[in-house]
Amino acid sequence: MITVVKRNGRIEPLDITKIQKYTKDATDNLEGVSQSELEVDARLQFRDKITTEEIQQTLIKTAVDKIDIDTPNWSFVASRLFLYDLYHKVSGFTGYRHLKEYFENAEEKGRILKGFKEKFDLEFLNSQIKPERDFQFNYLGIKTLYDRYLLKDANNHPIELPQHMFMSIAMFLAQNEQELNKIALEFYEVLSKFEAMCATPTLANARTTKHQLSSCYIGSTPDNIEGIFDSYKEMALLSKYGGGIGWDFSLVRSIGSYIDGHKNASAGTIPFLKIANDVAIAVDQLGTRKGAIAVYLEIWHIDVMEFIDLRKNSGDERRRAHDLFPALWVCDLFMKRVLEDAMWTLFDPYECKDLTELYGQDFEKRYLEYEKDPKIIKEYINAKDLWKKILMNYFEAGLPFLAFKDNANRCNPNAHAGIIRSSNLCTEIFQNTAPNHYYMQIEYTDGAIEFFEEKELVTTDSNITKCANKLTSTDILKGKKIYIATKVAKDGQTAVCNLASINLSKINTEEDIKRVVPIMVRLLDNVIDLNFYPNRKVKATNLQNRAIGLGVMGEAQMLAEHQIAWGSKEHLEKIDALMEQISYHAIDTSANLAKEKGVYKDFENSEWSKGIFPIDKANNEALKLTEKGLFNHACDWQGLREKVKANGMRNGYLMAIAPTSSISILVGTTQTIEPIYKKKWFEENLSGLIPVVVPNLNVETWNFYTSAYDIDAKDLIKAAAVRQKWIDQGQSINVFLRIENASGKTLHEIYTLAWKLGLKSTYYLRSESPSIDEKSVLDRSVECFNCQ
C-alpha cells in the first residue's frame, strides 16, 4: 500500500480521488484546459511516503509549463493549485478561518498592529469576505502577492490569505472614519475586485506594526556642509523604511567655485553625489535591495557635463556614481536655444542662487541679466551640442531622465506656496519642496541664546562688524561673552508620494468611475493621517499640502478589449474622455472631503481656490490633439469650480500616474499607461522563469495588442499629452525605440515634442530591441519597487 505524508506529518493511505478533486476544481469552467491533460502531463511518480507538498508542486509546475499564447488559462489553473496549497498552510483546510482568528493569530506573532480591530464589527465584516475572489489571480499575480505582500511569521511561514489581507488593509485605512464599517467595506470591495489598487508600500505595510505607507520622497539640498550632510541622514532614514528618493542638488556650488572667499576651492557637486551613492548602497532596505535615489540638477549648472557622465564606466572613478539615477531639470530657455542652435551659458549657483527659485519669464529675465554680468563666473557651450550629449547618453544608458521645469511649475496648483525643484525617482510626482534653512545660534556664557541669519551683519563690543557666521567664542556682544556659535536648521519641505491606481480594464464607464474614484481618493487621504513618517519634516510637509497621487493602469488591456488601436484617433478620444471623468470626480471628492474634514493648510490663494483646474492650464498644442479641445466637456466644470471655491479642497495635489508594474502584475492587467512588451514573455521570480501572456488574449483582442516597440514613440508622447491635460502632477512615461530605428534626429523629435506638448517629464528610454527568442525575459531590475 502506498502512503502519503501530509503537511502536519500524519501518514495516511494515498487516495487518488482527493487528487482528482483538486485537479477538477483547478480546471473547472476554464476554456482551453482539461483535468485529464493536467493529470497525464504531470507524470506523477507515486511512491511510498510521497509528500502531499511534492504532489502539489508537481501539479503547479505542470500547469505553469503549459501557459502559452493559445492556452493562457493554464495560468489560472496554476493559481488555483497554488491557492489550495496556501489555504492548507494558513488555515489547515481549503478555506478561510474567521476574521477574528486571523487577527488574533497575526497579533500574537507581532505582525499586525494591535488596537484597531476592536473598533470594528468583526462578525459583519467576516460575513462580507468573498473567498471566490481569490480565483481572479493568475499564477504570477498570486506568486507576487505571496512573495511580497502576504504576512509571514518569524519562520517565513504564511499567516495571511488574500481576502484577509484586503479586509485588514481596508479596516486599517478606515479606522478613523465615522461610519468605519461601511467605509472599510467600500475599501475592501474596490481592492478585492481589482477595480483599483494601492501602491506597494501601502499594500505591504498597512495593518502592520511598521505602517510606512508612502512610495517615495522628494527633497532638496542647500549649499552648506551642514545641510548637505543633514540631507544624507534624511535620505538614509527615508531609504531605511523603503522609500524611493528624488533629490535636488542644484543649489550646491559648482566645481571651481568660491569657498570662504577663495576662488577655485570647490570640488563641485560630484564628490557629494558620490557620498549619496554610498548612502543608497549602505542603507539597503532590510537587506532586500539597495536604496534607490534619483538626483536632479538644473541644466544651467556648471557641473552639468560631468553630471551627465555620472554613471559612465570610463573616466575618473572618484567622479562616478554608478548606483544613482541622474535627472536633468530642463528649462524652456534651454530648449529654445537648442532649436535656435544658439549658445548656452552655464553658471555657478553660489552666485546665481535665485535661478533655482524662478521659472518662466521671471527666470528668463534673470538668466539674461546674469549672462550680461561680467563679474559672474560662467562657461559657454553650444546648446545643441549639450542636447546631443544628453540624447546620446539617454540612448546608451536610458539616463539621465528629463524633467521640464517650466512645464511643471506653470501647472503647479500651489505655486503661491513655493516652487517645484525636481520630481521623484519615477518622474511622476511634482510638488513644492524646499531645502532646510540654516541660521546661527549664539549661546552666551550666562546661558542666554540669540539667533541671527548667517550673513546678518553684527557689530561686536570691540567695534568689529562681521557676518554672524564668523562670530566665535572670543567675541562679546552687548557685554555678553559668547560661549559657542553653532549653525542650526529650520526644516524645509520634503514632499511625499501616496499612490494608488484605478484599473482601467475594469473601470472604464462613467458610472464606474463615479463610484470608484471617490472611494480611492478617500482611501489615499486616510493614508496621510495613518502613515508612519520617518521624520518630522516629511510629516509636516504631507500634513501641509495633503498630497495624494491617484493614477491609472491597464490602459493597453482596456484598449484591446474595446478593439481600439494604440495611437489611433479613437485611442486619444477614449483616454481623453476617461481622464476627464477621473479628474472631475477626484476634484469633486476632495471638495466633498474638505467640507467633511477640513481644507488643506495651503488652500487659500492656491489655483484651486480661484477655481483654476489642471484643464484650465492645459497645453494649447495638446488641446488640439482631440476634437474636444477647450469645449465639449462632458462634466459640469463650472459647477465644480463654484463648489471648490465654497468648500475648499482637502488635497493640494491629487493625480499622478505611476509605473505600477508590481500591482498590475498582482491584478493581472497591463502595466500603467504603457503598451505591452510582447504578447508572451517571461518574468523572473524566486521560483524561476514564469511564462506570462497578456490578459484576455483572444481572436478579438489579438490585433489590438501591439508591442511598444512597434508603436511610433511620438504616439506615446501624444497620448501622454492628452492625459496630462487632466492631471495636476505628472506621468511616468517610458519611451520605446528599436535600435535600428534610433537616430539623433529621431530622439530630438521625440523629446522636443514631449516638451512642446506640455509633458513634465520622461522616464527611461528603452532602446534595446526585444529578443526574437521565445524566452524573452522582461528586465525589471531598473524599476522603482515603491511606486509600483
Swiss-Prot record:
Disulfide bonds join 216-497. Pfam families: ATP-cone, Ribonuc_red_lgC, Ribonuc_red_lgN. GDP binds at residues 200, 424, 428, 661-663. This is Ribonucleoside-diphosphate reductase subunit alpha. The record marks 216, 497 as: Important for hydrogen atom transfer. It comes from Helicobacter pylori (strain J99 / ATCC 700824) (Campylobacter pylori J99). GO terms for cellular component: ribonucleoside-diphosphate reductase complex. The lineage of its organism: Bacteria, Pseudomonadati, Campylobacterota, Epsilonproteobacteria, Campylobacterales. The active site is at 424 (proton acceptor), 426 (cysteine radical intermediate), 428 (proton acceptor). SUPFAM superfamilies: PFL-like glycyl radical enzymes (SSF51998), R1 subunit of ribonucleotide reductase, N-terminal domain (SSF48168). The record marks 763-764 as: Important for electron transfer. Provides the precursors necessary for DNA synthesis. Catalyzes the biosynthesis of deoxyribonucleotides from the corresponding ribonucleotides. GO terms for molecular function: ATP binding; ribonucleoside-diphosphate reductase activity, thioredoxin disulfide as acceptor. It catalyses: a 2'-deoxyribonucleoside 5'-diphosphate + [thioredoxin]-disulfide + H2O = a ribonucleoside 5'-diphosphate + [thioredoxin]-dithiol.
